[in-house]
Amino acid sequence: MSADKWCARTDLALETQESLKKANTDMRGVNFSEKKLDNGIIVSVVTIDSENAVRATGRPKGKYVTIEAAMLSEGDEECCQAVTRELSKELKSFVKAVCDKRIYAALVVGLGNRNVTPDALGPRCVDSLFITRHIVKEYGRYAFSNENVNSVCGLVPGVMAQTGMECLEILKGVVSEVKPDFVVTIDALAARSTKRLGCTIQLTDTGIVPGSGVGNHRDGINHDNLGVPVIAIGIPTVIDAVTIVSDAVNASRENTAKLMSPKLNGMFVTPKDIDETVKRLAGLLSEGINMAFSNDEYDDYSE
């Protein structure tokens, strides 16, 4: 990073929209709506539907839904339950938009490095999923009390440093064999604002580029590359160190860029209680996904 150029990264379309609005950037094609629910939950929708919007935001066309709940970071049980229900509702809406089947096959992919706590959200989420594909394949849908059970399978592909393969390469092979109707990816994200760490969930129908939030770009996991729709779900667990320094000196008259040390480039900060946070959020995500895919079957097994 040069002394006169730095960039605070974010994976959240909502934060990109806020930055563009603050900078009075041309936002034609960027549509925004917001609704407030009980328990302090805020659901925001950003849609990008023009080439101008793609250039302005640096994001592909599509729909980005953000669920925010400040109490979520505190582990408030009532809030967590409400967010889980809202997540399930939003995911069902995304699934309905990309798949017109009443009974479908879904592949859930937990992206990230299980051995790095802030990045372990995806793998830990998949650990708690209600997996049904093997049972449906072996015994048929009559093995369940509800014959309308969906076929759900999960995968944790690891990271390139562990496997020597791009996640996309692994997924292409799995998708060609399993033939899911759609893929859901779970990944830890990077945020621009500290207030959104651990209490914000983003869903999008555009897929995801693993590692993009921390400047470690890999091949995109999306419809174009996989041949099936990809719904991406993520929660920010880290923030760029440059952002924290920028916020700290923003009120001064100093040139912020000159105060940025090159050593901050590539450095990210995570909350001190990230172990418990990731464990709690992974459970919340898996519960919401199970509810969305269940067709009521999961309720019988979760009691």
Residues of each region from the PLM?
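Gly/Ser/Thr-rich loops at beta-strand to alpha-helix junctions
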Residues: 111-119, 161, 188-192
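Proline-aspartate-enriched helix->loop->beta-strand connector
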Residues: 175, 180-181
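Glycine-rich phosphate/diphosphate-binding loop of Rossmann-like nucleotide-binding domains
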Residues: 113-150, 154
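A structural-propensity feature for long, helix-poor, extended segments
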Residues: 143-174
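An N-terminal, well-structured beta->alpha segment
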Residues: 51-97
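A structural signal for small-residue-enriched, beta-sheet-centric alpha/beta enzyme cores
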Residues: 155-156, 185-303
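Short glycine-rich or small-residue beta-strand-to-loop segments that form or flank ligand, phosphate
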Residues: 66-70, 105-116, 154-158
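N-terminal amphipathic/basic leader segments beginning at the initiator methionine
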Residues: 1-60
